[in-house]
Amino acid sequence: MGTLNLGSVSLSSSGTTFANSAASVTDAPAGSVVQSATTTASGAVATSSDGPNASGLITTLTPRLSGSKFLTILSGVNAHSNKTSSDNHGTVYYMYVSVAGGSYANITSNVIQSHHVDGALGAWIDVPLTTTFLSTPTYTLGNTVAFQPYYARATSSSGTVYFHHTGHSAAASQVYNLTVLEIAS
């Protein structure tokens, strides 16, 4: 009935039968999602350390193509501020990567997301956090590539800093996740 062309790959149909001219994933045109992986967790994650601190939420995949880009999507997190407890103004978030089981390193030299409340709240507040980040880590085919969000205090203080806060009963079982998409480049 019709043909969809994506670069050198064609997808055609006649009735309910589809034909794909791609011989393998290596034929995927630039910008195509090659694979995805998701890790889901629940429960509060917190520390009294300034950071950056590992969140423990790790998503790992083995790239199918050389030179791919990776889109990380962190969602469902409750960012937290508590102005009644040692001036906990909020949290900054980073994305770290480990290649072939090596040490985790910041993908960028900076923060990828932050949550900050300046001023006296008189109470605590949770704010929904979703963040995406596109990166191109260096790897060799066959290596695993593991992504993990890290977090740190938004300001100097001595209170607890939260990656994910479950301060009210409805949030106690709330899930959050990290999805990673491998994208052909």
Which stretches of residues belong to each language-model region?
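Extended, low-complexity regulatory regions
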Residues: 57-59
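Terminal beta-strand-rich extracellular "head" domains
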Residues: 40, 44-51, 64-185
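Secreted extracellular polysaccharide-interacting domains
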Residues: 53-55
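Glycine-rich, low-complexity segments
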Residues: 1-45, 185
